[in-house]
Amino acid sequence: MFKKRVIKDSRVSKRKIGDINEASEDAPDTQVTKKSTLITKKSDIQKKSVVMPRSSPQTPLSKSSSDDAAAVEVVSQKSKKGELKPLAANIKTTIITDFQPDVCKDFQQTGYCGYGDTCKFLHVRDESRQKIPIKKDWEIGGQKEVKEKEDIPFKCVLCKSDYKSPIKTECGHIFCKACFLDRYKAKKKGTCFICHKETNGTMVPVNIDKLSATQV
């Protein structure tokens, strides 16, 4: 439980004191050498610090390799804004710009719009009037003739192209024969595309000459 006391010899203590004195005598010499080494290191650092800024701006880009030059060109091209890359030869792009965004395209192409008078776009057919010769457009005919001209679109509403073997349904609307049969047989829709009345599959052929005369 209790620690034993160790009696130290006086000789050991004297030797330690002698060693400490010798170390203290050698210490100033080591301090002097350390100071000298520090001074030399500081002088070297100052020299290097003076030389480095002179050498840094003198590194021209011409000494860089071709790969580095190519990389610099790529970075400079990316930094430029508003420049487009050349298109690939195997890619073709078509751009369609709408110069009349306020005009109803369905009414302009076919002469019919499903929204009718509630459509928020303009119902204008100026371009279609230029294609078809107009005779005495300023004269106003009978009200019945005007109604007939307004009801008949100048193109098929289903395929949006010129009439091919046109037919008339029971409700009085005109379509292409192939378009009407495709809608009636394949899609199994027996109602009229314009007025949504039942047609029962009945259709009457219409003469193209008479149809072109009644169109606007």
Swiss-Prot record:
GO terms for biological process: generation of catalytic spliceosome for first transesterification step; snoRNA splicing. SMART domains: RING, ZnF_C3H1. PROSITE patterns: ZF_C3H1, ZF_RING_2. Residues 19-38, 43-68 are annotated as: Disordered. Associated with the spliceosome. PANTHER family: RING FINGER PROTEIN 113B (PTHR12930:SF0), ZINC FINGER PROTEIN 183 (PTHR12930). This is Pre-mRNA-splicing factor CWC24. The gene is CWC24.
